[in-house]
Amino acid sequence: MITLAICYTINPNKLGDFKEYVAAELGPIRHSGGNILGYFLPTDFAGPTNEALGLIDVSDLAAYEKYRKALAEDPVHKKNVARLEQSSAVLATNRILIQRFQER
């Protein structure tokens, strides 16, 4: 199992727009083969207010490639991305693939 970690730098004044994007993306992500572990938003009481994180599991690298292709072709995803870009809620995105450490 590998996890796609999507690290977002967001405009804290556009948090509502980002939340709408995340809610709208849950369906396309699942439909494309991603298992959503969760989206995590900044808090008002600790840490930076402009960072968010999405964690999505896929079984292996081949499944990740299939997921990325299916998501890129999804018409709802395309609309969501266009709406997000228009809102300027996300300033930067960084994607990394990580694996869970499992103690033996």
Locate the predicted segments by residue.
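An amphipathic, aromatic/His-enriched active-site/gating alpha helix that lines ligand/cofactor pockets
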Residues: 20-38, 57-95
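Short, surface-exposed ligand-recognition loops at beta-strand->loop->(often short) alpha-helix junctions
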Residues: 10-18
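Specificity-determining recognition surfaces
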Residues: 99-103
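Short, well-ordered beta-strand segments in beta-rich or mixed alpha/beta enzyme
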Residues: 2-9, 40-72
